[in-house]
């Protein structure tokens, strides 16, 4: 067997574009939140809501809007990091099949839904439900990947 995918017992591996598009959209979400946050914080400074010396002492009084966007932005460096790692591993080991890509899309869609609720109504139950679905989907992706890797024949 010269094809690594066949040697690892894999079916059809998706194209790099199909695999990375959900990851790219998650990265875009992170940058959208960042570039939204910057002017909000600038406005907080110019309106006097927040003072630079308070930020330096880690005691800022950001506006509610700034806090919502900041927390949503910060949240993009928690669970999505595991998604980024898994996507790269799945591609490199040729385990990024159709099931992987579909689950990746579900993960990213629920991350967008969570971020949307976070920066709009901020309904904790709804936001938590969206987070829970994305966390469960990512856990399933990791479990499938681990099983595939651990049960693959040695090449």
Model-derived features with residue positions:
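Alpha-helical transmembrane segments
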Residues: 19-33
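Alpha-helical transmembrane segments of multipass membrane proteins
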Residues: 29-34, 114, 138
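Cytosolic, membrane-interface loops and tails of multi-pass inner-membrane proteins
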Residues: 35, 39-70
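Short alpha-helical packing/oligomerization segments
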Residues: 85-108
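Interfacial loop-to-transmembrane junctions
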Residues: 113-137
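Juxtamembrane boundary at the C-terminal end of a transmembrane helix
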Residues: 143-155
């Amino acid at each position: 067997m010269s094809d690594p995918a066949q040697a690892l017992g894999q079916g059809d591996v998706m194209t790099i574009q199909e695999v990375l598009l959900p990851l790219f959209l998650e990265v875009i979400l992170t940058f959208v939140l960042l570039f939204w946050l910057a002017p909000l914080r600038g406005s907080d400074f110019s309106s006097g809501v927040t003072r630079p010396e308070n930020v330096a002492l880690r005691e800022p009084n950001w506006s509610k809007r700034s806090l919502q966007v900041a927390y949503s932005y910060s949240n993009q460096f928690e669970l999505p990091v595991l998604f980024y790692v898994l996507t790269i591993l799945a591609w490199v080991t040729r385990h990024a099949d159709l099931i992987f890509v579909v689950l990746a899309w579900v993960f990213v869609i629920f991350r967008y839904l969570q971020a949307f609720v976070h920066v709009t109504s901020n309904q904790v139950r709804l936001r938590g439900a969206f987070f829970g679905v994305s966390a469960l989907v990512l856990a399933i992706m990791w479990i499938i990947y681990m099983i595939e890797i651990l049960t693959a024949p040695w090449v």
